[in-house]
Structures are given as structure tokens and as C-alpha cells.
Regions:
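Short, charge-rich, low-complexity interaction segments located
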Residues: 72-88
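Acidic, low-complexity mobile loops and tails
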Residues: 1-51, 84-123
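Periplasm/extracytoplasmic soluble domains of Gram-negative envelope assemblies
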Residues: 57-60, 68, 101
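Structural motif
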Residues: 18, 69-71
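Residue-level recognition of beta-strand microenvironments
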Residues: 12-14, 58, 75-78
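ATP/adenylate-binding site constellation spanning eukaryotic-like Ser/Thr protein kinases
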Residues: 66-69, 113
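A short, glycine- and basic residue-enriched loop/turn
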Residues: 49, 55-62
């Protein structure tokens, strides 16, 4: 399983034709204490870099964009009652949803962890 990152600070962990999606540790840190996550509906069809979900924190409200195209097949219901999990474990337990990817080759438009870390240094 490999992680890929977008310039908007979302990640996707790819396993076969599914991708688990969340926001990066960097994004979670920048947001501050997360107070609410608006999860997508299971069955929602999304396009790469299109709107997927939303997240609110003490500092800001932000949209979450889909790093890949496909259909949402699962959501992290834990976040409905404990959104702070995103702060505690943004790239593991704080995942947002799972997408059945319609075009797995789209990950080629994303960054590896190493490339993302280099990108962050340039911000």
C-alpha cells in the first residue's frame, strides 16, 4: 500500500482499486483543533480534485477534495462523534472515506510522501 498526496494536502492510500482518503498531518496541524467533519455520502461519485467533504476547526472551515475519481464506498463514522481523531492521527485513524477508484492511474498526478515533504518545505 502506497500513500500519495495532493497539493491541497489530501492523501490517498492505495490498495488494489480502492483508495482510503484523508487529510495530511500538515493540514491537520494548520487547521488546529478539528471540531466537525462533514463526511460524504456512501455512493457519492467524485471526480479527481472535485469536492468530497468539509472540515471545520477552531481556526477555519475548509473543503476536502478527492485525490482520485470514483465512488465513495465507506466513510469513517467515528469522525461524526469524535472529529478530533483527525488531529490525533490524520494519516491513519483519521481517514475520511474509502473510494472505489474509477481510474487508478490518476495517482500518477499526485506526489509520493517524499515529494510531498519536499513540496511542504517550499511553502
Amino acid at each position: 500500500m502506497s500513500y500519495f498526496f495532493s497539493k491541497e494536502h489530501e492523501w490517498v492510500k492505495v490498495s488494489g482499486t480502492t483508495g482510503t482518503v484523508g487529510i495530511s498531518e500538515h493540514a491537520a496541524h494548520e487547521l488546529g483543533d478539528v471540531t466537525f467533519v462533514e463526511l460524504p455520502q456512501v455512493g457519492k461519485v467524485v471526480k479527481q480534485f472535485g469536492g468530497l467533504a468539509a472540515i471545520e476547526s477552531v481556526k477555519a472551515a475548509s473543503d476536502i477534495y478527492a485525490p482520485v475519481s470514483g465512488k465513495v464506498i465507506a466513510i469513517n463514522e467515528t469522525l461524526e462523534n469524535t472529529p478530533e481523531v483527525v488531529n490525533e492521527s490524520a494519516e491513519e485513524s483519521g481517514w475520511i472515506c474509502v473510494i472505489e477508484m474509477s481510474d487508478p492511474s490518476e495517482v500518477e498526478q499526485l506526489m509520493t510522501k517524499e515529494a510531498y515533504d519536499a513540496y511542504l518545505k517550499g511553502l
